[in-house]
Design a protein with these regions (language model features):
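DNA replication initiation on ssDNA origins
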Residues: 1-71, 83-86, 157, 162-165, ...
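Structured alpha-helical segments in the cores of large, soluble enzyme domains
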Residues: 56, 83-100
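Helical (often loop-to-helix) elements that flank the catalytic cores of nucleotide-handling enzymes
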Residues: 84-92, 112-139, 168-184
Length: 234
């Protein structure tokens, strides 16, 4: 199976639309200027091949017309971000996330599931993970629990990694914080996929003890002595 086909399966989402991005110069704030737009029509293997070849960047919309997802992501849009430190925390908390460097140096933390799951459920778990990681204000994809497909809503896309293939700045990080090749990324995704029951069993690197009626991430925050700040989030 080609790399493009594997990425298409990994980032399977909306069949109604996808995203394209043309990257320009990097501004003084460290953020790359870009022209991004939603394009009606299915994301194809051919378009992803162009992405891998560095010709045209593409993005996938996680939520489909039935409000289901097979992947989601946290978008931590901080350009002085210590990627290795954050990646280390992901593994410390035993979160089923794969970190990829974004086009401007931030982090996309991807969650991949074995089957289609309700978008609302994916967003719920990603919200817990964002709080546990200390980034409760970050963007979450999908951005909606539900879309009105009959009115033409399609959702929001997130740029895919490995623009330019292995010669890229949008690479995934392994457990040691080193960049992965595209082939290594494919293998990592296959190992990282989870079911809804797997998500329900997450312990965030510890054992459940208190807050038994609430999100487990509150236990993590409490153990760090910072529960008051977050008590009204959920």
């Amino acid at each position: 199976m080609s790399d493009a086909k594997k990425l298409l399966e990994t980032f399977e989402g909306s069949s109604a639309a996808h995203g394209t991005t043309v990257v320009g110069r990097v501004g003084r704030n460290g953020k790359a200027e870009s022209d991004s737009r939603v394009v009606r029509g299915v994301l194809t293997e051919e378009k992803i091949q162009e992405h891998i070849e560095g010709k045209m960047g593409v993005g996938s919309i996680p939520i489909n017309q039935d409000n289901m997802c097979k992947f989601g992501a946290l978008d931590i849009d901080t350009y002085d971000l210590d990627l290795k430190a954050l990646n280390s925390k992901v593994h410390q908390l035993k979160l089923p996330l794969i970190m990829c460097r974004s086009k401007s140096g931030g982090a996309h933390l991807y969650l991949f599931t074995k089957d289609w799951e309700p978008a609302a459920l994916i967003r719920e778990y990603l919200t817990e993970m964002s709080v546990a990681l200390g980034y409760s204000g970050c963007e979450i994809f999908p951005k909606q629990d539900k879309i009105l497909a009959d009115r033409g809503d399609v959702g929001n896309f997130i740029n895919m990694p490995y623009f330019g293939g292995d010669i890229t700045t949008r690479y995934a990080l392994d457990t040691k914080g080193e960049s992965m090749t595209l082939a290594q990324f494919h293998k990592a995704v296959s190992k990282a996929k989870v079911s809804a029951s797997d998500l329900d069993s997450l312990t965030f690197g510890g054992e459940r003890s208190h807050f038994t009626d609430g999100p487990y991430c509150l236990e993590v925050i409490s153990s760090q002595g910072a529960v008051t700040e977050y008590r009204n989030i959920f």
